[in-house]
């Protein structure tokens, strides 16, 4: 599905919420960097979510991996890549970008930050405000749940699906659902 999107719309400005080790942004650089210059904004606290803390993940290493991975991808790109890293909560970083005039600015928004429903809803609303008309937004972890991997009781407020569904229902007149593979949901702004 990603390749279909890349052939359907020209992507030059990218917003990623939740960057972790940079796998997605490096993929985007590898796929889109040969076509044109890119302006990329990556937002992450690099503190990890509760699931990372439960697993004992060293988030300093994760952030270092992000820096190394993105620097390598940028150095191998045919075109210019301007990557801006925001080490902040998504609510603060997204609000800052909006206050800097980034409304209707991005061609592509990828939401893969916190899994807590209230955070996901905030990311969706603010990210959508910054998405251009005909731009594409992808929600990762649509059906993610922590209960299986962490062996803790399921709390629907700690998973993305409830927030993504609420966002879709509220904004349905302003978007179209492109596809919904099991783990991701793709929308396009009208």
Give the positions of each predicted feature:
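S-adenosylmethionine/decaboxylated-SAM
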Residues: 2-190
């Amino acid at each position: 599905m990603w390749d279909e999107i890349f052939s359907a719309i020209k992507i030059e400005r990218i917003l990623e919420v939740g960057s972790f080790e940079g796998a997605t942004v490096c993929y985007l650089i590898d796929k889109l960097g040969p076509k044109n210059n890119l302006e990329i904004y990556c937002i992450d606290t690099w503190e990890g979510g509760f699931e990372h803390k439960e697993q004992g993940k060293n988030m300093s290493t994760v952030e270092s991996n992000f820096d190394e991975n993105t620097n390598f991808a940028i150095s191998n790109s045919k075109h210019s890549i301007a990557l801006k890293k925001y080490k902040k909560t998504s609510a603060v970083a997204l609000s800052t970008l909006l206050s800097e005039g980034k409304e209707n600015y991005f061609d592509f928004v990828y939401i893969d930050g916190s899994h807590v429903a209230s955070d996901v809803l905030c990311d969706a609303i603010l990210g959508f405000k910054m998405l251009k008309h005909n731009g594409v937004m992808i929600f990762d972890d649509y059906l993610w749940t922590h209960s299986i991997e962490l062996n803790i009781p399921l709390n629907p407020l700690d998973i993305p699906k409830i927030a993504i569904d609420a966002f879709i229902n509220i904004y349905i007149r302003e978007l179209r659902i492109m596809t919904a593979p099991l783990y991701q949901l793709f929308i396009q702004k009208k």
